[in-house]
């Protein structure tokens, strides 16, 4: 075969292989391929409405390891744990959403007027599981309709070797039959790291960064929700404004850490820190492509 003909054949084979690879990735729903399939990371516009439950392979149930299967949510309220929620009076509005996302041990009792009382999904860091156990009767006995989504890496979450946190989750499902507990799969955790690197240009580990529970919550919400309202999350420029009020880092820990002081300290720390402000800049960019609204404080994406 002549050189020009061989070159054309090589190009055609490459195109066909690439097309087949992308189609297989999308069909299989592999998290590590999603960046190729879904307009870099997340599709533009609202999430397509698909009748019936969907399978989400990035989340694995405890103890059987089955993927998350559930109906998509038409409207979602993502409730920040920030002190911005104090005095908001948005509880009824939050509870009116079809699905309500909460994070870690953020309580509702005593704060219903501001943060609502419903909890559809609670995204929990593996380090926060012991904090929920301090009030296990409330979180796991009374709130039986809540789905718990736990994220974490390393030996504590190891299913095969029985990591400490995983053993705790396993025990909870035995104590409370019917309790819905899921974990982010290893592939999904790697995918979340890759999104951070693609969005910021920085490798998470090499830059000394820990992703926040808010990061994992937003990614989960983007998969499950058609429309998202985020309550109590400030913009990436908020803490640089001279007129911003001082509020507690968590609405349920009054008189403790200041929100902006915490954000700035983590952003400037060289190692082992959350990059809260960087993450908020990323969320702002996502809101340009997806129906995400930020409320209390209300701010527009730039």
From Swiss-Prot:
Keyword Transcription regulation carried by entry: no
EC code(s) of this entry: 2.4.3.7
Subcellular location: Golgi apparatus membrane
Gene3D superfamilies per record: Glycosyl transferase family 29
InterPro entries named among the record's database cross-references: Glyco_trans_29, GT29-like_sf
The keyword Ion transport belongs to this UniProt entry's keyword annotation: no
Pathway the protein takes part in: Protein modification; protein glycosylation; Glycolipid biosynthesis
Lumenal side: 28-302
Biological process, per Gene Ontology: ganglioside biosynthetic process; glycolipid metabolic process; O-glycan processing; oligosaccharide metabolic process; viral protein processing
Function comment: Transfers the sialyl group (N-acetyl-alpha-neuraminyl or NeuAc) from CMP-NeuAc to the GalNAc residue on the NeuAc-alpha-2,3-Gal-beta-1,3-GalNAc sequence of glycoproteins and glycolipids forming an alpha-2,6-linkage. Produces branched type disialyl structures by transfer of a sialyl group onto a GalNAc residue inside the backbone core chains. Prefers O-glycans to glycoproteins or glycolipids.
Protein name, entry field: Alpha-N-acetyl-neuraminyl-2,3-beta-galactosyl-1,3-N-acetyl-galactosaminide alpha-2,6-sialyltransferase
Species of origin: Homo sapiens (Human)
Upper lineage: Eukaryota, Metazoa, Chordata, Craniata, Vertebrata
